[in-house]
Amino acid sequence: MPLPQDIRPVFQDIQDTLVRAEAPWIEQSPMAKVKVLWVGRETGTWASLHHWKKGYVAPRHKHLAGAHAYVLSGKLQVRDGVLNAGDYVYEPSGVLHDETTALEDTTYLFICNGAVLFFDENGFTRYTNWEVMEKLRAQADAQATPRAEAAE
């Protein structure tokens, strides 16, 4: 039966995003790595998995948009509280964070709707946004391709 209206996507390149479990992690430091799951260019939102080894300290930062975090395993010291496996936190736009510390090896899902600015006592040090995450994903894909071709 035909549909009463045309509901085909206006943009024909719209498609699902699938990231396999074996997708590569990107090392950001010896104590921290990230796996980029999705980048939404049209909204500036991105989704990523982060794995921090016990003792890793993330620098002070400010959220320029809301963000969601869900702890899959481990334990994080965030401001004056502790997030455990199974805990969810929403961080609104404008929130300032002091250092965040991994109290155990920790993996968490992070969905951010905009940029995050990092700073120290001397001021702004760097930022992360969808463009940075897109570059990281492209870098990981490029590194994974030779391994996949070698396996064939």
Question: What feature does the model see in each segment?
Answer:
Residues 47-52, 71-74, 88-90, 99, ...:
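Short, well-ordered beta-strand segments in beta-rich or mixed alpha/beta enzyme
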Residues 33, 67, 104:
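Residues that flank catalytic or metal-binding motifs in active/ligand-binding sites
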Residues 54, 63-78:
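Glycine- and acidic-residue-biased ligand/ion/polar-headgroup-sensing regions
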Residues 93-122:
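Ligand-binding loop in jelly-roll beta-barrel domains
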Residues 78-98:
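Short acidic-glycine-tyrosine-enriched beta hairpin
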Residues 29-62, 92-96:
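Conserved short histidine dyad/triad with adjacent acidic residue
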Residues 1-44, 124-152:
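A short, N-terminal "cap"/entry segment at the start of jelly-roll beta-barrel domains
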